[in-house]
Structure formats: C-alpha cells, structure tokens
C-alpha cells in the first residue's frame, strides 16, 4: 500500500487578507480511501490487532461514517475481515442507495444494522458479549476510532517542520485528533478545535486524552446547527474554495472548520503576521452521500 506522508503542507493565499499566513496540511492525500485522521487513528490499532492475533476488526458508525468506510478499506488492504455495526435498522434495504455503505460492502465489510435505541447500548458489556457470541473473536474499534492508540497515531500529524506555526486549527468529531495535536504541539502554539456537532461535552472527552489544558480551546460557533447539518452558505464556500485553491473540502468536518477560520480572520481574531496551520482530516468520501441528500432537498450540490 502506497502512502503519501511527506510534503503535505500547502500554503494558501487569501484574496482578502495578506497579513495572516495560512497553510493546509493535506492529510486527505495520504491514501485514496484511508486518508486523513482515519489513517492516523487506525495505524497503531492495526499493529496491535496483528500482534494480538486478531483476524477480524469490528466497529460502529452511522450511514455516512468516514470511519466505517476507512475501516472497510483497511480490511481490504491488509487482509482483515471487517464488521460494521450500523446505526439505523431502516438502512438494511438501502445499501446501494448509500455511497458509504455500498463502498464498505464492496470492500468486504459485513454490515449489521441495528435500531437507534439499541445502538445507544453499544458500549455496554452485555451488548459486546452478544456480539462476541455472534461473531466470535474480533478486535474492537470504537465509534469514530478514538482510543489511546488512535491518539498515539494522531500525535504524529505534526512534524518538526510545523513548529513555526502559531495556531493549529482542526475540526472535532470524537476528540481523538485534536487530543493528539494538543499532546504534540509546542509550548508557544495554540490548538483551536472546531466541533462539527452541538454540545459542550467534547471538552471533557478531550481532557481524558490530553497532557495539557493550557494550549487549546474549542470554537463552538461553526457547527451549522449540528452534526451533518449544512446550508447554502457553507456549500457556496466549499465550492468557491475549491475553485480558488483546487483543494476539496468535506461538508461535515473540514469545510465547517475552514469556514470558521476564514470568518475569524475577517473579524480580526488573529494578529498580523500570525501563521496558521489547518489540518485537513480527509472525509471526502462523504461528499457523494451529502449530495444525495442535497439533491433530495433541491439544494445546490458540492462540486
């Protein structure tokens, strides 16, 4: 498997502001299907699974989950069987209508659909015991992929070439990626996380995995109403940004985060000559699924 792990930093020139420097770390280019933070989160988990003799990976996710797609692709690439426990039993007959689930299935993942009520019990020991009875031995990956080994992988996102940046900006889902960045950032750097969903619970989740509470904060103003929710302003921004920079953005995570960073620059949040590193966490597979939903609503599509 070929991975692109070098020379990922791409400077971006802003048409409206020459006093703040933006560089995007193109983690989306690491691999066509196992890209961005998903590669980072899976790396050491795969090593552990292999060392412990597991042949099967089991994980959880929703209908358009980047983690489900990446885990399926990982299994295909590395010879693991994969099982995806999918939220929403109504999706059982709609696999081919859903680009993410169709990709996962074609990549060899066995999909088990459960009700949303049962999905809430996914971390309960009785439920995991039932899964072990059904599927025998498996290596468990949590929803979103965040655990201690995932944090270890995300700590490798920043390299020695990144120490000259003042701010590091990243989208936040389960909190694993930002935790890795917080742990590896230099003392003079500030990490800004942009949650893709509503709720202040993420702060405590992130604290579980971090060594410092001083060098980071969450910007909760750019979730666009919650997880998976977008509007025409965000679509316009994503499409315009791609035209101007040739960098595609996903609408769930990186698109929202970059919209927020640009808005903050316009409102003078950052001082002159500030150097900002933006982490592109991939997730581009989700564009196709989002466009299906946008088309149903008669809204503009993401290019």
Residue ranges and their predicted role:
Residues 1-303:
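PLP-dependent amino-acid enzyme catalytic core
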């Amino acid at each position: 498997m070929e991975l692109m792990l070098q020379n990922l930093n791409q400077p971006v020139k802003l048409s409206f502001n020459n006093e703040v420097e933006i560089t995007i770390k193109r983690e989306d280019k690491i691999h066509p299907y196992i890209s961005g933070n998903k590669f980072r989160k899976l790396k050491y988990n795969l090593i552990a699974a292999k060392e412990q003799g597991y042949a099967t990976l089991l994980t959880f996710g929703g209908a358009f989950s980047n983690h489900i797609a990446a885990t399926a692709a990982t299994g295909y690439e590395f010879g693991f069987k994969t099982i995806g426990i999918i939220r929403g039993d109504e999706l059982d007959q709609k696999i081919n209508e859903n680009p993410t689930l169709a990709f996962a299935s074609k990549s060899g993942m066995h999909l088990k659909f459960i009700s949303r009520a049962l999905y809430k019990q996914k971390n309960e020991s009785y439920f995991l015991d039932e899964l072990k009875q059904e599927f025998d031995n498996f290596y468990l990956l949590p929803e979103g992929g965040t655990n201690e080994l995932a944090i270890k992988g995300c700590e490798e996102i920043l390299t020695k070439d990144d120490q000259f940046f003042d701010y590091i900006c990243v989208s936040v889902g389960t909190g694993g990626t930002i935790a890795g960045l917080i742990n590896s950032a230099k003392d003079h750097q500030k990490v800004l996380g942009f949650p893709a969903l509503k709720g202040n619970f993420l702060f405590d989740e992130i604290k579980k995995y971090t060594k410092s509470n001083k060098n980071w904060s969450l910007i909760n103003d750019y979730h666009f109403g919650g997880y998976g929710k977008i509007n025409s302003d965000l679509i316009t921004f994503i499409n315009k940004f791609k035209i101007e920079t040739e960098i595609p953005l996903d609408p769930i995570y990186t698109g929202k985060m970059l919209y927020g960073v640009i808005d903050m620059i316009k409102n003078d949040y950052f001082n002159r000559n500030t150097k900002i590193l933006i982490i592109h966490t991939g997730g581009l597979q989700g564009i196709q699924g989002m466009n299906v939903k946008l088309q149903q609503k008669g809204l503009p599509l993401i290019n």
